[in-house]
């Protein structure tokens, strides 16, 4: 059926008025163009046109092939009208080749298709979406010819028949209306066609989009015919939407030959969708939803990230590290062009290497589902042509057909069984992975195609994976190919009973009653989120730059580096992954957090290992507390990269975040006692959880392992902290960093507050502690018997402090935070102290000393004593209010104030146990003291003391800053024979769990040449590493101690000498002795007299010297710097000290690379006797 003349004129007039109303500017722009012979399109929105006149819409849907030429004619008339109405100008010239291009059809099944049209669609105008898989060469098409009748000389024009492949069918008789009826015609064009009767012509083949098909469906293809300006508008691999009329065509008929009809789409307009996200609409509402999600996780963004990771491939249990890596690869980096014009790829590539059954293919399948433009192929049977591009012969000519990588341009290409690709085919993807193009020279066709795709590959090792060999040997892939992967994760299916049990229960639970978690994101939401974050363009910050560059340099210098992997590509990989992680976290700046996370992931992959060594990615599960894990990664990585300033800033930021979270969770009116009780409870619970013993395969995180038996004293020395952070948070670490932050004003006021709060802290502890109330004696005994395991050389596993001691340390560190309550409780403090003093005096003196030494009540700094005796010796302070101090003899010199224990000086002795105090003073305490105490005491003795500077630097930096003033020198005014003192067995024990945050030094006054003496207290293991001496060394040590004493005639009763902890049996014996009472020894009065004769004498020739810089040697577990050696003749005998050789090359052992804890106090315990 054809349109009538009135209908044709109506359509023409309506369309012309529509163009003049809506597209006048477009037409003017076309008229200004210089090339008169080119073809120019005017894009018309179908919805707007149909709204203007519904009748036109009906005609258009019914007779598209007839209406489209009418539109073109109306467009030419409209252009002429615009030209005449416009101001005359030489620029404006009429263009004959104008085409109306219809787009924006209403989205309804009749007009919009995602599948290839069928026969019933013939003659309809449709939009079809698909992927270009083949493009033919551009040809010249002669679409009309002029003929002349030989008889009547009538000239007429014959059109090429589209349905017969543009063949010309001459009429059977002359078309002259006068009735010539001649059958003889001559073609006027002769051998050459005039340009006006020819046009450009190209055929392309589109294929249904794979991701829109059901599983098992083979995508179908369709030929699309492009003419005029549509030619070369797309290329192989493009996602396009074609608007056009479905038509059928056939070859010319031949006798006895079957007529094959072919459906083709005659295109009216082609829209390339590469930049658009297929199937995902992102509006403000969707964006707002994700912004609210991240606002909710503002104080703990890593928890939000882990929620997204848990939704990634939820059918696979655990594999936290792999999920993080896949998420970063899917997010992708930022593609950029440098100053020289070189394009640097933004897409990352990931290779999963693993034993069968480790879930590799599951990740590939899931990634294909949530990525808009993706191709999944198996390496088995894939040829280089199948992956890149192939030349095929069609209709007597060669064409290029796109392979998997080209089809995945701008998306994701997943290749399973990667090692099954033949060697010569595998090299064909080198260019596709790095330059992201494919250069082809096949069958006379030379071209270059884009392959801007992310490659996610999975492969099995050949045979069993051998950790001793390199990756390239295990999976038989060459170094050039391996170096192009940003991450290579190894999943080793090792025998792990705990892991197998968890996995089997997870699978069986899903089989029995499959349930959908409320918190997991749906696949649609994941797809939308990954499409949204690809629009973010993160910029690198200075901190992240510094970390990535430092890590790259360390990798290059590493002994175990893989030369094929640690090329400049490693640095580019780090940058891409950091940008990807910033995108994943919905940020437009790459922060230090992103850089640290990327370094930790890279360390866990086969490219890493410079910091942590190779790690198995299989047995990793989600951390209970992501911030704790991240904090530990920060300390580990930044310490190892020697970026202490960045570490300090980041820890401050984390503390601030944690404080904000805490304030939100708990009302501000919470009392100090409640906080203390809560902290104590946490610490006790963490004690009971005990240290977990991680398996070799555990990495960035793992399940909490079963507790170790209490009697087991052998620590796991493997560096596992990054892989297996303990679930319990190290509260004291946070408190100390917060304390450092609060104390950066340079004054010592905070120390006063700390001391004033100690009694209050202790009092609150007794009120709120979940432990039964025990006398100090029993407590000391219990602590010794319980904690034989806790202070071994196990510096690699984060240590859990003894329950009570840890909680008390927490209380102490929290104390300065509660400054507002000092005045209320200061009076209670004095009464409490008196009460404890009398309680201590009831027991016999040595028992009291045992109680002091092993007590775990709280930190008791006798500031009143300090003030009193400082005043008497140097008249620096005015007066004190503590009545107990007046009872002590006034002969106590300044040095007597110095060695105050930071942990357990709980019982203040008075004159009744002065004998015990004198003995203890004789053997000067080597306990750790907090930095605050050292500074307070330094102030007290003014210029006679070392100078300490307190800043905001991290502990290690503080350690390196303090210096000595060159004025003090200790001298012994008494005879040498009197300088020998016995060491009581009850006084040479160190508290097993006692390792506070650690870099505080014992800054006592001492001769400069002895100032470097350090004592490394590492429990029994520490003892084994020290040289074993004979019993005769005891007297030598005692003499040395006597010389060093230099005037410390009397120290109040809580100063003791702490040495390495004895074995548990010895501790038990000591505890019995303490309880026994009468079996202990008293000091004779002559010794006290000799002690009281020591005095100070300063030498002008003394030189100040700073302590040695402390370095970490992760491979060397020995303590190199102590000049004070411990000699053990028999493990059940008391320990004695001898001065070692000062010139010995030495390094103080710090925490292991994998330890969560700060620097261990014991290893940095400088003793200045």
Curated annotation (Swiss-Prot):
The keyword ATP-binding applies. GO terms for cellular component: MCM complex; MCM8-MCM9 complex; nucleus. It is found in: Nucleus. Residues 685-751, 784-804, 926-1009, 1053-1080, 1098-1121 are annotated as: Disordered. ATP binds at residues 354-361. It comes from the Eukaryota. Component of the MCM8-MCM9 complex, which forms a hexamer composed of MCM8 and MCM9. InterPro entries: AAA+_ATPase, MCM, MCM_dom, MCM_lid, MCM_OB, NA-bd_OB-fold, P-loop_NTPase. Residues 691-710 have a biased composition (Polar residues). Its EC number is 3.6.4.12. SUPFAM superfamilies: Nucleic acid-binding proteins, P-loop containing nucleoside triphosphate hydrolases. This is DNA helicase MCM9. It is an enzyme of class 3 (hydrolase). Belongs to the MCM family. Residues 932-947, 968-979, 1065-1075 have a biased composition (Basic and acidic residues).
């Amino acid at each position: 059926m054809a349109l009538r003349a009135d209908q044709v004129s109506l359509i023409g007039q309506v369309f012309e008025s529509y163009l003049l109303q809506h597209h006048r500017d477009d037409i003017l722009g076309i008229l200004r163009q210089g090339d008169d012979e080119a073809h120019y399109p005017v894009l018309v929105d179908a919805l707007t046109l149909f709204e203007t006149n519904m009748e036109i819409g009906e005609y258009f849907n019914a007779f598209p092939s007839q209406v489209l030429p009418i539109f073109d004619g109306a467009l030419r008339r409209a252009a002429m009208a615009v030209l005449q109405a416009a101001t005359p100008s030489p620029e404006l010239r009429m263009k004959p080749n104008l085409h109306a291009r219809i787009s924006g059809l209403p989205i309804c099944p009749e007009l919009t298709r995602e599948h290839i049209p069928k026969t019933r669609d013939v003659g309809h105008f449709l939009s079809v979406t698909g992927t270009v898989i083949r493009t033919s060469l551009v040809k010249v098409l002669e679409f009309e010819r002029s003929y002349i009748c030989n008889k009547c000389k009538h000239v007429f024009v014959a059109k090429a028949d589209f349905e017969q492949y543009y063949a010309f069918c001459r009429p059977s008789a002359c078309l002259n209306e006068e009735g010539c009826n001649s059958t003889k015609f001559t073609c006027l064009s002769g051998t050459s066609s005039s340009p006006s009767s020819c046009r450009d012509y190209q055929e392309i083949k589109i294929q249904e989009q794979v991701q829109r098909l059901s599983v098992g469906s083979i995508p179908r293809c369709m030929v699309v015919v492009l003419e005029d300006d549509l030619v070369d508008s797309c290329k192989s691999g493009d996602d396009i939407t074609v608007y056009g009329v479905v038509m059928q065509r056939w070859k010319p008929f031949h006798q006895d030959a079957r007529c094959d009809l072919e459906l083709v789409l005659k295109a009216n307009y082609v829209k390339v969708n590469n930049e658009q996200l297929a199937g995902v609409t992102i509006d403000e509402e969707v964006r707002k939803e994700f912004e609210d999600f991240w606002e909710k996780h503002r104080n703990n963004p890593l928890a939000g990230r882990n929620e997204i990771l848990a939704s990634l491939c939820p059918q696979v249990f655990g594999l936290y590290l792999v999920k993080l890596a896949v998420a970063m690869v899917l997010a992708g980096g930022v593609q950029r062009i440098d100053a020289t014009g070189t394009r640097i790829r933004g897409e990352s590539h990931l290779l999963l290497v693993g034993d069968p059954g480790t879930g590799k293919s599951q990740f590939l399948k899931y990634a294909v589902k949530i990525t808009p433009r993706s191709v999944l192929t198996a390496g088995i049977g894939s040829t280089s042509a199948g992956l890149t591009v192939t030349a095929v012969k069609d209709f007597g000519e060669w064409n290029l057909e796109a392979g998997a990588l080209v089809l995945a341009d701008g998306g994701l290409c997943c290749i399973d069984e990667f090692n099954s690709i033949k060697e010569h085919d595998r090299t064909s993807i080198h260019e596709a992975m790095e330059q992201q193009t494919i250069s082809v020279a096949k069958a006379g066709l030379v071209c270059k195609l884009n392959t801007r795709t992310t490659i996610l590959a999975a492969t099995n090792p050949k045979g069993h994976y051998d950790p001793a060999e390199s990756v390239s040997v295990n999976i038989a892939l060459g170094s050039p190919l391996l170096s192009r992967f940003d991450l290579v994760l190894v999943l080793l299916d090792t025998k792990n009973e705990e892991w197998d049990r968890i996995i089997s229960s997870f699978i069986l639970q899903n089989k029995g009653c499959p349930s959908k978690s409320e918190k997991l994101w749906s696949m649609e939401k994941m797809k939308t989120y990954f499409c949204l974050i690809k629009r973010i363009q993160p910029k690198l910050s200075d901190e992240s730059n510094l970390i990535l560059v430092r890590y790259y340099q360390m990798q290059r210098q590493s002994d175990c580096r893989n030369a094929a992997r640690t090329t400049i590509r490693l640095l580019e990989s780090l940058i891409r992954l950091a940008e990807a992680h910033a995108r994943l976290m919905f940020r437009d700046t790459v922060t230090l957090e992103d850089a640290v996370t990327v370094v930790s992931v890279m360390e866990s992959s086969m490219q890493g290992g410079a910091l942590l060594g190779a790690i198995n990615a299989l047995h990793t599960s989600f951390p209970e507390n992501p911030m704790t894990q991240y904090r530990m990664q920060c300390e580990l990585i930044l310490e190892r990269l020697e970026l202490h300033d960045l570490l300090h800033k980041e820890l401050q930021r984390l503390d601030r975040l944690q404080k904000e979270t805490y304030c939100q969770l708990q009302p501000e009116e919470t009392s100090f006692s409640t906080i203390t009780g809560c902290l104590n409870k946490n610490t006790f619970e963490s004690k009971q959880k005990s240290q977990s013993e991680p398996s070799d395969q555990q990495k960035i995180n793992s399940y909490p392992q079963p507790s170790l038996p209490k009697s087991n004293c052998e620590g796991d020395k493997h560096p596992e902290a990054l892989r297996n952070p303990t679930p319990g948070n190290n509260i004291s670490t946070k408190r100390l960093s917060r304390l450092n932050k609060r104390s950066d004003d340079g004054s010592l006021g905070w120390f006063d507050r700390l001391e004033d709060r100690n009694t209050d802290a202790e009092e609150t502890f007794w009120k709120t502690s979940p432990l039964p109330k025990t006398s100090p004696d029993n407590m000391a005994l219990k602590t010794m018997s319980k904690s034989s395991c806790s202070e071994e050389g196990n510096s690699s596993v984060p240590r859990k402090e003894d329950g009570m001691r840890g909680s008390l340390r927490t209380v102490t560190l929290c104390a300065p935070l509660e400054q507002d309550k000092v005045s209320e409780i200061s009076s209670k403090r004095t009464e409490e102290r008196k009460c404890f003093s009398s309680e201590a005096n009831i027991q016999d003196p040595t028992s009291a000393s045992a109680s002091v030494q092993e007590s775990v009540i709280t930190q008791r700094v006798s500031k009143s004593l300090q003030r009193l005796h400082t005043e008497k010796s140097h008249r620096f302070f005015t007066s004190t209010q503590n009545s107990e101090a007046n009872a002590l003899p006034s002969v106590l010199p300044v040095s007597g104030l110095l060695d105050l224990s930071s942990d357990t000086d709980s019982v203040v002795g008075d004159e009744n146990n002065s004998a015990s105090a004198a003995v203890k003073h004789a053997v000067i305490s080597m306990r750790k003291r907090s930095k605050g105490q050292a500074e307070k005491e330094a102030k007290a003795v003014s210029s006679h003391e070392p100078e300490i500077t307190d800043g905001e630097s991290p502990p290690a930096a503080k350690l390196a800053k303090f210096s000595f003033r060159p004025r003090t020198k200790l001298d012994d005014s008494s005879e040498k024979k009197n300088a020998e003192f016995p060491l009581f067995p009850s006084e040479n024990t160190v508290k097993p769990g006692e390792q506070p945050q650690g870099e505080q030094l014992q800054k006592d006054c001492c001769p400069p040449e002895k100032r470097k003496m350090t004592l490394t207290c590492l429990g029994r293991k520490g003892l084994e590493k020290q040289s074993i001496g004979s019993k005769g060394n005891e007297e030598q040590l005692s003499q040395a101690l006597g010389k060093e004493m230099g005037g410390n005639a009397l120290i109040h009763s809580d100063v003791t000498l702490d040495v390495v902890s004895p074995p548990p049996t010895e501790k038990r014996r000591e505890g019995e002795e303490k309880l026994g009472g009468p079996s202990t020894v008293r000091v004779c009065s002559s010794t006290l007299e000799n002690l009281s004769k020591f005095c100070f004498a300063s030498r002008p020739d003394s030189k100040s010297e700073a302590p040695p810089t402390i370095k970490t040697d992760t491979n060397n577990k020995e303590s190199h710097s102590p000049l004070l050696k411990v000699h053990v003749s028999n493990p059940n005998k008391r320990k004695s000290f001898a001065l070692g050789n000062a010139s010995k090359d030495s390094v103080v052992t710090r925490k292991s690379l994998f330890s969560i804890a700060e620097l261990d106090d014991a290893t940095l315990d400088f003793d200045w006797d």
